[in-house]
Amino acid sequence: MNERLANEKISKLLLSLAIPSILAQMVTLLYNLVDRIYIGRMEDGALAIAGIGLCSAIITIITAFTNLFGRGGAPLASISLGADENDQANKIISNCFSSLVLSSIVIMIVLYIFGEEILLLFGASANTLSYAKDYLNIYLLGTIFVQLSVGMNYFINCQGYAKFGMLTLVTVSYTHLTLPTILLV
C-alpha cells in the first residue's frame, strides 16, 4: 500500500488524488468533442451527429457496467489494503478484472446481434440508422479496452497512484485524438 495514504494530511491527499482525476476526465471529454468535430465536418455531418447521439444511451449503459465493477470494487479493495488484507484485495481486483472482461464480451455479442433493433428502439430513423450502426460497431471493437482501462484505473487511484492513473487515460486519449488526425486529414 502507498505509505502516503496512511501518513499524509487528508486535505493534501485529497488534492493530490483529485486533481489528476479531474484532469483525466477533462482530457476524456476533449476527445469526445474532437470526435464530434471530425464527424460534424462530414458530408452528412448532421445525420452522423444524430447517429452518435443515438449511441450515447448505449455507451452510457456500457459505462454503467464499467463503473459497477471499477467504482464498486475499488473501495472494497482500498478497505482491504488499508486493513493490510492484501490477499483479499487481490481477490477483489481479480474478480473485478474478470467481471469487466466478461461483461465486455457479453455486451459486444448482444450489441452485434441486436444493435440495430436497440438503435431503432432508441429512435433511429432510416436516415440515421446507418451512421449509428457504423459508430456503434466501431465503438464495440474497443469496448473491452475501454472497460479495462477505465475500470481498472479506479484500482490504480485507490492505491494512491492518481498521477499514474491520469497518465494512462491521457495516453489513451492522446492516441484517440491523434489517430483521426493522421487517418482522416
Identify what each model region corresponds to:
Residues 39-60, 127-131:
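Interfacial/gating helices of multi-pass transporter permease domains
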Residues 1-18, 77-144, 177:
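Short alpha-helical transmembrane segments in multi-pass integral membrane proteins
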Residues 23, 35-39, 52, 77, ...:
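Hydrophobic/aromatic residues within transmembrane alpha-helices of membrane transport systems
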Residues 35, 73, 114-115, 152:
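Hydrophobic/aromatic residues in alpha-helical transmembrane segments
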Residues 22, 26, 30, 34, ...:
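Generic alpha-helical transmembrane segments of integral inner-membrane proteins
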Residues 175-181:
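Conserved small/polar residues in nucleotide/adenosyl-binding loops
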Residues 11-30, 58-65, 141, 167:
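Residue-level signal for short hydrophobic patches within transmembrane helices
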Residues 49-109, 146-165:
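Small-residue-rich hydrophobic transmembrane alpha-helices
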